[in-house]
Structure formats: C-alpha cells, structure tokens
Amino acid sequence: TDPGHLQDVXVAINDPKXGVFVNRK
C-alpha cells in the first residue's frame, strides 16, 4: 500500500508492516 494513503486523517495509524495506514474507528 502507498505510504501516503490515508483512509481517515486523524485516526489513521502507521502500521509497522511497511508504512501501511489502517483506519481506527
């Protein structure tokens, strides 16, 4: 996944698997 890909700003966290952003709700 593109490290600049944000699913939701503010709640997105940097996944240690490679800079993958995961949406936390």
Swiss-Prot record:
May play a role in plant defense. Probably has no oxalate oxidase activity even if the active site is conserved. The keyword Plastid does not apply. Its main location: secreted. GO terms for molecular function: metal ion binding. Keywords: Allergen, Apoplast, Manganese, Metal-binding, Secreted. This is Germin-like protein. Signal peptide: none annotated. Oligomer (believed to be a pentamer but probably hexamer). The three different mass spectrometry results appear to arise from different glycosylation variants.
